[in-house]
A protein has these predicted regions:
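Short pre-active-site segment immediately N-terminal to the catalytic Zn-binding motif
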Residues: 361, 468-488
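Extended, hydrophobic alpha-helical segments in both membrane/secreted and soluble proteins
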Residues: 278, 369, 464, 480-492
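His/Asp/Glu-rich acidic catalytic environments and adjacent acidic regulatory segments
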Residues: 1-28, 32-35, 76-290, 305, ...
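Active-site-proximal, well-structured secondary-structure segments within enzyme catalytic domains
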Residues: 126, 130, 159-165, 169-219, ...
């Protein structure tokens, strides 16, 4: 049987990754992983090697990681009902298998025996470190728990996966369900023209207004929310947008309040089962903070250091509003701080950040980014033409074109400038849409390897995703300075 999610080809045929293929592909991947784990467990303890234990464990679930990784990526950038349903059906099975690996007593015995072998001292520092981290991962995942406690731990892991997934779905769905339609253009005073035009076109696309009688649609997506909170003169408009942002995942069909309480309780139970005082201690135990108390101390210390400057700035903004309105201002409301801070900044420094946008088209920003990194690291970054098909849709890509999951997505190849060797490639998906979760992130789809053992280099395949200003009509996407910083951050 053909398994598109498990296809190891470097370039992904995204249109073949349909919701219908999720169950058979992940079922097959779990079956392969179970057989690989069984092989590790069945070997005699007297003849263990690195390759037959830790090396084999690293590769045991490769197909599952590949397939599920692609599925989770599509869940983040292209959430749709049939796909969500298929993921919901398979998530418990994936979690059950993943939890069972560190809870497998025979596998744990084999790994501990291998870690105590004399040959470990002759391994490279990288492999020794991998052994240490793997053992720590297993202990952190319940390997040392008594057998009668392991089922409870596995059930907690399963419930956490389901509830955190539902939490994220509620955030996306409640964000998409919220809209504010403005009928009076006077309410939009102060908004940049680009934000007004984007809101007008969004309203048209969603059935509000006409060319002759326009309406303006605002949502809780950052590119719609942020300009209003920073520039809109209407206090009422800013307040409604702020109240909307506070309503995401709160009340109604997409309420997350009960889920949050359940997730916190499950995390606390998990931490106590593993011998930690609280979940914060568990989460920080292998990080620089070392404990929840240390992390909280750091946060409180930082808070105490910055609070005086913050209060000083807010007092200056309060006085500024008082001066400009001629009215007594006891304190600033949350929907006022960004607006009045921006007006004060413009007056103090005679600088409007919006004036930078014409210089920050996505194309120019990417060109500048690549120029900097080419000089730093001796690489070249080259765009490739792209083509997008709908899931299940067959089509022939133009020669040299790379298939992507959405028409907005770009694709680049990265080569060594001197040798021309292909080091890796990456996708870039910069603009918001209803099927895409909020925020910005980078991730890998397949991890490359340097040349070794006579094998050539395996290039890396990664991705960068954001939710930045969209093109307006036939005009290019012009970014804010903060959005430019985000692109540099994700690429770095």
């Amino acid at each position: 049987m053909n398994h598109p999610y498990l296809d190891p080809s470097f370039l992904v045929s995204w249109s073949r990754l349909t919701p219908e293929a999720i169950r058979p592909d992940i079922t097959e991947a779990i079956s392969r992983a179970k057989e690989n784990i069984r092989t590790i467990c069945d070997q005699p303890l007297e003849s263990l090697t690195y390759e037959s234990t830790f090396g084999a464990l690293e590769k045991a679930s490769e197909d599952l990681h590949l397939g599920w990784g692609r599925i989770m990526h599509l869940d983040s950038v292209n959430d749709e009902p049939a796909q969500r349903e298929a993921i919901g059906e398979m998530l418990p099975e994936v979690v059950t298998f993943s939890s069972s690996v560190p809870l497998n007593p025979r596998l744990w015995t084999v790994l501990k025996a291998a870690a105590s072998c004399d040959w470990v001292e002759d391994l490279s520092p990288v492999r020794q470190r991998f052994i240490q981290e793997t053992l720590a991962d297993f202990r952190e995942s319940g390997a040392d728990l008594p057998d009668d406690v392991k089922p409870e731990y596995a059930e907690i892991e399963a419930q956490l996966s389901l509830k955190t997934k539902k939490f994220a779905e509620n955030v996306l769905d409640s964000t998409n369900a919220w809209e504010l339609i403005v009928e009076d253009e006077a309410e939009l005073s102060g908004l940049p023209d680009s934000a007004k035009e984007a809101a007008r076109l969004d309203a048209l696309a969603n059935g509000h207004g006409t060319e002759e009688a326009p309406r303006w649609r605002f949502t809780q997506k950052f590119t719609s929310l942020q300009p209003v909170m920073q520039f809109a003169d209407s206090d009422s408009l800013r307040r409604r947008m702020w109240e909307g942002s506070c309503s995401i995942g709160k009340g109604g069909e997409y309420d997350n309040e009960a889920l949050i309480a359940e997730i916190l309780e499950l995390r606390d139970r998990k931490a106590h089962l593993l011998g930690y005082g609280c979940f914060a201690d568990y989460a920080t135990s292998r990080r620089m903070a070392g404990s929840g108390a240390n992390a909280l101390k750091f946060i409180n210390d930082l808070h105490d250091k910055v609070k005086p400057s913050f209060l000083k700035d807010m007092e200056a903004v309060r006085r500024y509003k008082e001066e400009k309105t001629g009215k007594s201002v006891e304190k600033l409301s949350p929907w006022e701080t960004g607006y009045w801070s921006e007006k004060r900044r413009r007056e103090l420094y005679a600088f409007d950040e919006e004036d930078l946008r014409p210089y920050y088209s996505v194309e120019k920003v990417m060109e500048g980014l690549f120029s900097i990194y080419s000089g730093l690291y001796g690489i070249t970054v080259t765009p490739r033409p792209t083509v997008a098909f709908k899931p299940g849709e067959s089509g022939e890509a133009p020669e040299g074109a790379v298939e992507v999951w959405h028409p907005d997505v770009l694709f680049y190849e990265l080569h060594d400038a001197e040798s021309g060797e292909h080091l890796g490639s990456f996708y870039a998906d910069w603009h918001p849409r209803d099927s895409k979760r909020a925020g910005a992130w980078m991730n890998c789809l397949s991890v490359g390897e340097p040349p070794h053992g006579g094998k050539p280099r395996a290039p890396h395949l990664g991705l960068m995703v954001g939710n930045m200003t969209k093109p307006v009509g036939d005009k290019p996407a012009l970014l804010s300075h903060r959005e430019v910083e985000t692109i540099f951050h994700e690429f770095g």
